[in-house]
Amino acid sequence: MLDVAIIGCGVIGAASAYELSHYRLQTAVFEAENDVADCTTKANSAILHAGYDPEPGTRMARLNVEGSALAKEICARLDVPYRQCGSLVLALSPEELPHLQKLYENGIANGVPGIRLLSAEETLAMEPNLAPNVVGALYAPSAAIVSPWDFALAMAEVAVRNGVELHRSCPVTHIEKTADGWALTTPDGIVETRYIINAAGISAQAVHDMAAPHKFTIQPTRGEYYLLDKSEGSRVHHVIFQCPNENGKGVLVTPTVHGNLLVGPDAVRVEGDNTACTAAGLAFVSTAARRSVPSIRFGESIRNFAGVRANVDTGDFVIGEAEGAPGFIDLAGMKSPGLSSAPAVAKEVTKILKAHGDLPAAKTDYRDGRTRVRFKECSPEEKARLIAENPAYGRVVCRCETITEGEILNALREEIPAATIDGVKRRCGAGMGRCQGGFCGPRVLELISKTLGISPLDVLQDKAGTNVLLCETKQEENHHD
């Protein structure tokens, strides 16, 4: 029997696995998709928020500030791309200045460090490409940008290294109470566990309702984005927000840790995991973004994408044991600032286990830390050494991002190996550049096929059913028969 079963391996599930892996617990993670961080965690604004937006006294307020500080430490320890660039919330008219004052007061109450109000002159001195009608801004120096999928993957990798089991493509389809805990039905069979952690993202309501009386409603909300080429990456140097509204933090403009410019999102209620991009949504995003940064060149867009966030009708994170379901712990409604809060949310789980007397001693042989080879960032001497040790580092496969065959093979052989083209991209960056895999994609597919010992026809772009190749050319006629 397991001590803890975690349902979902986005950033909340991964952070929970990482936290619990420090203790002598039998823990397993069950992820419905074929990879870690394959839903909301891979498609969001990639920001670790400072913590001035949540209302004081809410879980969001406390966990945002605590989580952002913990995330900074974890990223340094696990070699995750991270940059503390700070954020600006703009007032674009005098009527918006009172809102900045309210956010400032929130920030002071929430313990956000270094927060201050700026004049128009101070704001434009920091960001000359902003709209000239800016009348002021709220500056939060502790805000940061991160690679969200790498953040989740790094925590999951270290958890697996320290004994946590990870089951991919393994959705939980039924939950039943037992005398000793819970029984989960999965494609791998029945799994018994003492505790369940519900970290299922937009599916958290459905998972909760399998085990306990209905308590909350997840309202999936889609946000569409532009990802612009690195030629636009220095258009701004801070995360640029407009004054938020009832739909969220509004359309933002932000640099990324990879050197691009990210613009979005809108906020549209959808059914399920509907990540379609729309002409109307993208038009709204580009028009709204130009209110902040008029000179953005959207002709430099290299990709559009959408993510779905788990808005919830409670207005705050849902954290704790479900009523009438002892041992079933919800971590639900993790909309923004869910990414920022994830490490602190995970610590709430250990507090619950400790309160029950079920948190054992910490491991004395814990193996923390992680490093990644990023060939393009190496010195000439380091590159020469790597190539001498492994000639695969001397073969550049992705020319846009200077990603080598050695890095791709690492992605296919690490503790949580990639199994898809997008899985490789998230681990090492191959296909993330201007041509979006147009050049390197076939070679990446070939390396996946050879390394994993599968047919090229079985190589997926991302989720199940996204096979890149339909058939062998000479068999096309027979295939259609």
Regions found by a protein language model. Give the residues of each.
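N-terminal Rossmann-like FAD-binding beta1-loop-alpha1 element of flavoenzymes
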Residues: 2-28
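Flavin-dependent oxidoreductases
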Residues: 15, 175-180, 184-264, 268-278, ...
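Glycine-rich FAD pyrophosphate-binding loop
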Residues: 22-42
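Dinucleotide-binding Rossmann-like beta1-alpha1 core, especially the glycine-rich loop
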Residues: 46-126, 250-251
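Short beta-strand to alpha-helix junction loop
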Residues: 62-65, 90-99, 138-157, 276-280, ...
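Helical element adjacent to the flavin cofactor pocket in flavoenzyme catalytic cores
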Residues: 138-195
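C-terminal catalytic lobe of FAD-dependent flavoproteins
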Residues: 248, 257-258, 273-396, 403-416, ...
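Iron-sulfur (Fe-S) cluster-binding segments and ferredoxin-like electron-carrier domains
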Residues: 404-415, 438-456
